[in-house]
A protein has these predicted regions:
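Short hydrophobic targeting helices and cationic amphipathic motifs
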Residues: 4-6, 13-16
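Short helix-onset patch at the extreme N-terminus, typifying the N->h transition
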Residues: 7-8, 27
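Methionine residue identity
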Residues: 1-2, 18-21
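Hydrophobic helical h-region of N-terminal Sec-dependent signal peptides
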Residues: 44-48
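N-terminal signal peptide c-region/cleavage motif recognized by signal peptidases
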Residues: 51-54
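Sequence/structural signature of beta-propeller domains
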Residues: 57-393
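Bacterial N-terminal signal peptides that target proteins for export
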Residues: 22-43
Length: 393
């Protein structure tokens, strides 16, 4: 079982010969050790156009659960993320943003655990790392968010044992203040996180109505800006492939392309590779991007093709060939998914309902029969996706 969002394996305080990923974990650990004690102390039109012209038939799966509608009317629900409870996977947490008000926490059945009013939190992403020395090993989870109210990148750091205790005591919630905050020089939009061999814990922060992307990392001094690059146009959805050091990012509006940046220690973003475009398999805006990892460094890149309400699968590895597409259709009790912004997928056995992982998708048009409700998130067993598409596991 694989999970893009956490890295396992004990990390020792003394430096030693390591593989690249272990070096990245060591870099994060070095920062954490110095910070640990302080913790303890304290495009609707485009969518309509492309939906009307696209009549192609695609395989369909059904959501098995959905979350309650978010508190805000209109275009509000946006981006999901997940924390895997490795001690009790069925008691994991789904995070979801209401980009006009804050962050929700849900269980795997879509039931609300908590809601924190934080302002305009647009996108979120997580990484969990097993850190410690010979005497003390703990998992820490890092929750990144793009805060449009304050124009910042926000970062919460949770010790997983404490999170588990709060879940058991029904007292879990995202704190109202982050552990770290970095003031951005752009109008913030989307965000995705990663673990990099050179820079450790990183976050890619995109610009609203602009082409810039900021790259941040966690240091002993807090969140530092590493560099800023030009992605060519407004971008939101992104995902970082830690093992392959590849940033996938969707450019919206005029061009409508999905790009891949294959990186090295120089973090040179000058030569993106075009994975797909509107001339290919993308309808309208490319939006949320996620990874579904399979053994031997294989797996799938998944993109929300928003304009025709489908999800595209590509090979995770270069040259990222398009494989197929699917939709999330309606069941007797849950409506279909359309006009999706953010998505999240992982390959991890969470429960008997999710034997091969999970997919969470924002639903841009949430309905109850003929009645339109506020937006929400739909939850899919990824086994159903693999079965209906008949692709390699």
């Amino acid at each position: 079982m694989m999970n893009q969002n956490f890295i396992t394996g004990e990390i020792h305080l003394g430096y030693r010969n390591m593989m690249n990923m272990e070096q990245a974990q060591q870099l994060v650990l070095h920062t954490l050790i110095n910070l640990f004690h302080s913790f303890k102390k304290s495009s609707i039109v485009l969518a309509f156009f492309f939906t009307t012209y696209s009549l192609a038939d695609y395989a369909e799966v059904e959501a098995i659960y959905e979350t309650p509608p978010v508190v805000t009317k209109g275009d509000a629900a946006d981006d999901p993320a997940i924390w895997v409870n490795k001690s009790n996977p069925s008691n994991s947490i789904i995070f979801g943003t209401d980009k006009k008000s804050g962050i929700y926490s849900y269980n795997l059945q879509g039931q609300e655990l908590s809601y924190t009013n934080l302002g305009n939190i647009n996108n979120i992403d997580t990484r969990t790392i097993n850190v410690g020395d010979d005497e003390n090993v703990s998992d820490f989870t890092f929750l990144f968010a793009s805060n449009r109210t304050l124009g910042s990148v926000d970062l919460w750091v949770f010790e997983d044992n404490e999170t588990r205790e709060k879940l058991e005591n029904n007292s879990w919630e995202v704190p109202s203040k982050p552990s770290f905050r970095g003031k951005s020089d752009i109008i913030v939009y989307g965000i995705c996180a990663g673990i990099d061999p050179k820079y450790g814990l990183v976050a890619f922060l995109t610009e609203d109505t602009g082409p810039r992307v900021e790259v941040w990392n966690l240091t002993e001094n807090g969140l530092d800006l590493i560099t800023t690059f030009n992605n060519g146009g407004e971008s939101e959805g992104c995902v970082y492939d830690d093992l392959n050091r590849t940033l996938f990012i969707s450019e919206e509006e005029v061009r409508g392309v999905l790009k891949a940046y294959r990186l090295d220690d120089s973090f040179d973003f000058s030569e993106p590779y075009i994975v797909d475009s509107r001339e290919g398999q993308i309808g309208g805006d490319p939006e949320g991007v996620s990874l579904y990892k399979t053994p031997n460094n294989s797996g799938y890149l998944i993109l929300s093709s928003q304009g025709d309400s489908k999800f595209n699968l590509y090979d995770r590895n270069y040259p990222y060939d398009y494989i197929t597409s699917f939709r999330i259709g309606s069941s007797k009790s849950i409506d279909n998914v359309t006009d999706t912004d953010g998505i999240e997928t992982i390959n991890y056995k969470l429960s008997e309902e999710y034997p091969e992982g999970i997919m969470i998708a924002q639903d841009g048009l949430n309905k109850d029969g003929y009645r339109t409700k506020r937006q929400n998130f739909k939850i899919v067993s990824f086994k159903d996706v693999l079965d209906v598409l008949d692709v390699t596991r």
